[in-house]
C-alpha cells in the first residue's frame, strides 16, 4: 500500500506547544492534523517548556532560515536556592544555597538582572543539541561526561521583572539567537550567590510572530477544518520569504 503523503499545503501554523512534548513530536502531531505533506519548525523548545512553535508548511519552509536567526522572547520562572545539571527543574541538583538562605532581596535581583542586559558571554549547557565530534552534547552529559565548551556571545535585548516572591521570580527576556535561558537562569543565580534553575519557560515571540495568535494542539484537533488555522503565504510579514 502506498504511503499517504498529505496535501500540498503552504502556510504557517503558530502552535502553542504543551509541556511534556518535544518540538518535533508537537510538529508531527500538527502536521498530521492539518494533513500537510511537508512541514518543519523554526527553533526547538525543550520538552519542559511551552509556548510559541512556528510550524512552516510547504513553501513556507523557505522562511525557516530567517526565523532561526530571529530574536526570541520568553517568560521564565527562576527558582532560587538550587542549581541543577540541566539548568531546569528536570535535572539533578548539583549545588545549593548556603545554609540559612531565606530568599533573594528584590533590590539585589534587579541589580543583577541589569548586568545581563547587552552583549554577554554564555557557556552552552551540556544538556544541549550542540555537537562535538558528530555527537550531541546531551549524549555525553547522559553518560556522565562533561566537556569543555568555549563561551559564545549572545545579546540580551531586555530583561523585565514581572513578579517576585523571594524564592522565585518571573522575568520577561528578549534575546538573540543562540541564547540559552537555562544558562541565563544559572548565571543569575551564581551572581546572586544562591544558585538558581528554571522552574518554567514559555516562549512568547519568534521574530514577528506572537503567541497571541497561536493555537493549542487540542484546539487545532477540535476544529472542523484545521487547515483554516494556517497563515496563508500572503499573510506573512513582508521580507520573510527569500527573493526569487
Swiss-Prot record:
Keyword set, alphabetical order: Isomerase, tRNA processing
Looking up CDD domains in the UniProt record yields: PseudoU_synth_EcTruB
From the UniProt record, list the reaction(s) this protein catalyses: uridine(55) in tRNA = pseudouridine(55) in tRNA
Enzyme Commission code: 5.4.99.25
Extract the signal peptide range. none
A molecular function GO annotation:
tRNA pseudouridine(55) synthase activity
Report the NCBIfam families cross-referenced here: TruB
Q: Which family does the record claim for this protein?
A: Belongs to the pseudouridine synthase TruB family. Type 1 subfamily.
What function does the entry list? Responsible for synthesis of pseudouridine from uracil-55 in the psi GC loop of transfer RNAs.
Question: Could you tell me what this protein is called?
Answer: tRNA pseudouridine synthase B
Question: Can you name the source organism?
Answer: Bordetella pertussis (strain Tohama I / ATCC BAA-589 / NCTC 13251)
